[in-house]
């Protein structure tokens, strides 16, 4: 796997192409958007400081977009994960958002994207991961933990298509202005990571999952400023529950606020909070909230320091994850990110550490 990562990075750096973003609505009419790609690799060392155990996790993502007729694009994305060691912590909320079973190749994104009405309305049909579109506000990306990538009330109560799984679905977006985004998605109720199952759409057997959100984002005055984001999202799921041998419907919501606070010289300060709740007899997670304090541009090269507090409530447990992390860019393509987590799971405490290197092309 290590040689695969190096070979992919080497091949990408030796080939020039304009990367306009596979899911950018503005790219559909631009001449340079006829063909574009992206490639990213993450390698992470992990250490359970309470037990002394160590681990190593790796993730490789690649995407490709090909312009077709006006406003239409064919999109594809693959994912590879490699973890030669066992998991080092038994926690409810995973401390690393790249932990996944070993699989050299997953097709996680494949379908047709079509834009209408001057790119204000977008429709995608095909394979897709929910965390491409939801739970991905700017400050959520500061954390290395899994809960900020998908709230536990959604991730733990459904077999949903978030990393590393995918599902067949219909995704619709509407952007009446650059600040407002309304989106909703209907997925197959069971997500998979193998090609022979991923393209299934079986509402009678697997049920369905619907996610949606309405958000308003106000960009900062400069490119490196924190942006303000206000979001409300919902989920509905109807699936077969093994414990009761019957179909079960659940509904829930989540809300996120990300707010710049002040700027001291070049350093920006911001705060964020998310809350979620699940109704109708959730099987695993009932409620969740988090809070984040962050400061960016701490050095002349950049650098963002974040303190993140996650609190999750389960039917048979409760857990708090406190994370301190610092993401430091090293040139144009590399980012170094150490992180320390303190977990308290129904009174059981442990310390976990990570050192992550990300390469993005």
Positions of PLM-derived features:
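Transmembrane beta-barrel strands of outer-membrane/channel proteins
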Residues: 37-45, 74-80, 123-129, 184-188, ...
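Repeated loop/turn-to-beta-strand initiation elements of outer-membrane beta-barrel proteins
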Residues: 35, 70-74, 119-123, 179-184, ...
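Loop-centered beta-sheet repeat module
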Residues: 173-240
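Outer membrane beta-barrel
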Residues: 61, 65-189, 283-290, 294-297, ...
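Outer-membrane beta-barrel "beta-signal"
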Residues: 349-361
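Membrane-embedded beta-strands of outer-membrane beta-barrel proteins
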Residues: 62, 110, 170, 212-214, ...
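Detector for outer-membrane/organellar transmembrane beta-barrel domains
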Residues: 217-314
């Amino acid at each position: 796997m290590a040689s695969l990562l190096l070979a992919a990075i080497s091949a990408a750096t030796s080939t020039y192409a304009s990367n306009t973003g596979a899911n950018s609505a503005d790219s559909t009419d631009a001449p340079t958007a006829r063909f574009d790609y992206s490639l990213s690799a993450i390698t992470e060392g992990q250490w359970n400081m309470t037990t002394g155990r160590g681990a190593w996790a790796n993730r490789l993502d690649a995407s490709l977009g090909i312009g077709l007729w006006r406003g239409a694009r064919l999109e594809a994305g693959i994912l590879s994960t490699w973890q030669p060691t066992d998991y080092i912590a038994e926690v409810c909320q995973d401390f690393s958002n790249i932990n996944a079973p070993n699989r050299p190749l997953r097709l996680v994104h494949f379908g047709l994207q079509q834009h209408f009405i001057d790119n204000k309305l977008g429709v995608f049909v095909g394979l897709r991961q929910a965390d491409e579109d939801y739970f991905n506000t700017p400050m959520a990306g500061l954390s290395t933990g899994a809960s900020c990538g998908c709230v536990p009330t959604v991730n733990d109560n459904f077999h949903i298509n978030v990393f590393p799984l995918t599902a067949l679905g219909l995704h619709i977006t509407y952007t009446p202005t650059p600040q407002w985004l309304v989106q909703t998605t209907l997925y197959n109720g069971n997500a998979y990571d193998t090609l022979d199952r991923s393209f299934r759409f079986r509402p009678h057997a697997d049920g369905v999952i619907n996610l949606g959100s309405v958000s308003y984002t106000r960009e900062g005055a400069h490119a490196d400023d924190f942006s303000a984001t206000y979001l409300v999202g919902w989920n509905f799921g109807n699936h077969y529950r093994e414990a009761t041998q019957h179909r079960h419907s659940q509904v829930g919501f989540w809300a996120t606020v990300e707010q710049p606070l002040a700027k001291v010289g070049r350093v920006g300060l911001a705060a964020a909070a998310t809350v979620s709740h699940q109704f109708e007899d959730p099987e695993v997670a009932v409620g969740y909230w988090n809070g984040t304090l962050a400061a960016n541009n701490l050095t002349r090269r950049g650098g963002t320091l974040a303190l993140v507090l996650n609190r999750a409530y389960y039917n048979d447990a409760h857990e708090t994850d406190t994370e301190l992390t610092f993401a430091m860019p090293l040139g144009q393509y590399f980012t170094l990110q150490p992180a320390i987590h303190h977990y308290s799971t129904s009174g059981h405490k442990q310390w976990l550490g990570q050192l992550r290197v990300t390469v993005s092309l």
